[in-house]
């Protein structure tokens, strides 16, 4: 790559970086350049090496797409980030584009670029599905898409290096299925799809299959790798210097060979037979050495189950978990999309392998937890609940003494409380701690440059979680500071009613998660209130806190592979946000279990949500006059469960706090 003429040392502001990108575009013949929020594994959360959108634009939200032309620049984000993006983009020359209010970036490019224009994007930041959708939208307008190189390499001189952290074995005490057993299940599913080989690039799937864990992505115990599974062998493409002897031995015993991370595209190009790929979770760069005739598969129409052109980002955002929704938007039954098979390529190459597109089988296998996984997770939830009792008792005591805390200190205190629990590894995501108006930003993140002190009257929202060797937690609670207003209690009670409505729902096994969303929102809709994010996402087992395939969001498509199944762990997290005033969200994790004593058996299996999260919901913010007797009874039952499970684990001030916060509501 030819370096930009702009000295890298001068690129200290988004405006300067934007100018450098435009200069590189001009040098290399691009009329527009796209910087998505992605990496070669289509991860929701990525190593810093691929945070190019953040580096150029200054917008630090986890999801967004930067598009730059010679005269315009914009970042497309969903409603969760509108306020944050407006503040961070001010003065940069980059405009906020509100998804849902404006045309998509794909439509903008198709509508405004002239015939013969060239749009560029780094091939390792573009999924096969996104590449196809862009091509389908741009080609009719005579606009060419090139995904060949990364222009940022030419002027991002201090780009963070690739991660090199150790890769370790997930302790056997917490593993319910061996890698060999998991591979056998995957191979059987691959064979059912008519494929001989399967390429997996999604990091959580690879970690789950290999029973290995890493720390390449902050908060997510995954590591950079690709996994190629054949009928009788498998190869892990990874920097093998990071594997200790135990990890190497575990892979050998499962029949998994090692190869350099960078060689995956060559290995794919050398395959014969048929290759199953998930088009939403494999990068264009991984397949770019295949002949054109092979890559033409599915280009006549979007793969089954994929989103409309330009809708991928919005679909992910609507699911309140980019990666979770991406998994839920894949081509579940797309083996029939592999229409063009072994035709010779125009270059004279022979197409040696046929592409078959479908969701990774491991995505569903991973999403359905075993009985042992659920038991381990219950223990992790109890540990987490005990830590939260200690934290909240300490927090309230500090406030009563007149100590002034800030949002950053809350994060430190809650992480320290979790760290005292057995098997704790790290937080499961960056803590969202927002006081009053800050909580109105669903993905607010306090920074050393911008945070609020907890003083005066109001409400404090804390959305946090932990990674334990025996499970992953995610919980949101809102607590009063000083005296809450009647309006705050009303809003909190509406959110609570929504939470209870879904928590008490019985539903058919196999129903689409998006169909459940209206049940949760109904109590709020009746008062003309709503929230802009999804209601629920899947959660991993000592893996990503956002996991597919299931999602509870009416914005997401209803797809067969993402149906609600027994053993899935999902969040229930309705919210209500008043910009400039306050924000409320109440979140528990639940597991799908079959109804124990069904009244009927003629209509199939029915499931219910069994609570996993153990922490009081603050009754000081509840207006019982707005609640039914059934809702009051639910709160009392839940608090009795919390008290029963946590009382033996806490003592002193934490136990006193638990007792006080789980006192039954009258009625």
Report residues per predicted region.
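Active-site neighborhoods and metal-handling regions in enzymes and metal-associated proteins
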Residues: 1-667
